[in-house]
Amino acid sequence: MDHDERLRLAADLTERLLDRHGAAIVAVGVHGSVARGDDGQESDLDLAVVTTGPEAQVADRSLYLRDPGLVVDLGAIAADAYLEEAGHIGPAWPLAADQYVNHLAVHDPGGFFHKLRHVHEAAVEEAGPEVFAAAAGFDLVQLLSWDATARGAELAGDLLTAQAALKEAAVLAALVVGLHTRTPYRNLSHALHATAATGAAGPAFAEAYRRLLDPTAEPALQVLALGRARDALLTLADREGIPYQAPGLDAFV
């Protein structure tokens, strides 16, 4: 299925949704690779259905459409909730930001997606360094947890758990770097490749991160690579004031 065929499918689905729900739908837009125009033969169709509120009975759906053989991911969200999300810089921001700024409107009589983009861009512009640092610190703490899981699982010979932990840690490292550099990613693949090429966390990080992602590397070597990438990120955090540690229990009170 090509780009134009996906757009026709989106238009057909939007028409059906409007017939069913009418004025409860504020806007419908395509996001992801189709909205950016870089979709390929196997790309999914991602749709955001914006509603007037939680009372609108539009359900989230992620289904494989047998004909033409394509995954359609439909997410329904109230307009106010979507705008609130767009105005928040959180731990997932590098991967979440694309959907706020890259929408291809299929139905948008009130210009909702323009407003969504404006709200998000204003939030990014107005957010101080401490906002991005706090979000990066949250991800870094999660990375430390997965790093410990990966090391423990590898030592115990539990390679399945070790591999799962390594993958989670790789994504979290990309989020830390993306937040530190204020870099939004198009998708997960872009996040991993961009992080592997970055110099933002120093040359030691980039080399270790590439080894971490190497599918031909032994799990033990990947765990070691994760440790080196972790250390580079901790050095970065200490230098740049990214909060991730507490001197004592009073920090939790």
Spans of model-derived segments:
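Conserved short hydrophobic patches within well-ordered secondary structure
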Residues: 25-29, 116, 173-176
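Short N-terminal helix-initiation segments at or just after the protein's N-terminus
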Residues: 9-18, 107-116, 246-251
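Intrinsic-disorder-associated interaction segments
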Residues: 3-6, 89, 105, 109-112, ...
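Metal-dependent nucleotidyltransferase catalytic core
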Residues: 1-24, 29-43, 48-99
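Conserved NTP/Mg2+-binding pocket subregion across the NTase superfamily
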Residues: 66-157, 252-253
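Conserved nucleotidyltransferase catalytic core and NTase-mimicking acidic/glycine-rich helix/loop elements
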Residues: 124-253
